């Protein structure tokens, strides 16, 4: 659980940096460290189905869904830095929908993120 808490703090730092205009300078390293901590990367997430991603992220503690939510948020933050953001946003959206269905708790925050992603996808399309 310590890993999940630390990754949550990293994501908060990513959002803070982006909102402060420092995202391009500081966020790539934080995103890379966070993916290494999750023992995954963008390529794996983009090329696998949510079920497979959950299994890979489960680890010894069975917290795959929690890690998947963090991975989805990392994809969103990475999309702000990418010259090709749509695949990242589409996968983040897919993972968040998967979480809404498979997690035991309904999340309003996830629903708001999904709405924001939808708006951004339409804007970029």
Spans of features found by a protein language model:
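Structural register within alpha-helical repeat arrays
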Residues: 7, 13-14, 71-78, 92
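Amphipathic alpha-helical binding modules
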Residues: 84-125
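N-terminal alpha-helical interaction modules that lie
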Residues: 1-68, 97, 119-125
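Short coil/turn connectors between adjacent alpha-helices in alpha-solenoid helical repeat scaffolds
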Residues: 17-26, 77-89
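Mid-chain, well-packed structural core segment of small domains
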Residues: 61-85
């Amino acid at each position: 659980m310590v890993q999940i808490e630390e990754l949550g703090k990293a994501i908060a730092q990513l959002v803070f940096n982006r909102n402060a205009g420092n995202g391009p300078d500081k966020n790539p390293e934080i995103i890379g460290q966070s993916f290494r901590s999750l023992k995954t990367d963008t390529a794996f997430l983009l090329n696998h189905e949510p079920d497979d991603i959950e299994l890979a992220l489960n680890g010894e503690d069975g917290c795959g869904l929690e890690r998947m939510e963090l991975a989805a948020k990392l994809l969103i933050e990475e999309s702000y830095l990418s010259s090709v953001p749509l695949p990242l946003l589409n996968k983040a959206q897919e993972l968040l929908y998967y979480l809404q269905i498979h997690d035991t708790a309904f999340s309003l925050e996830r629903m708001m993120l999904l709405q924001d992603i939808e708006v951004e996808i339409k804007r970029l399309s």
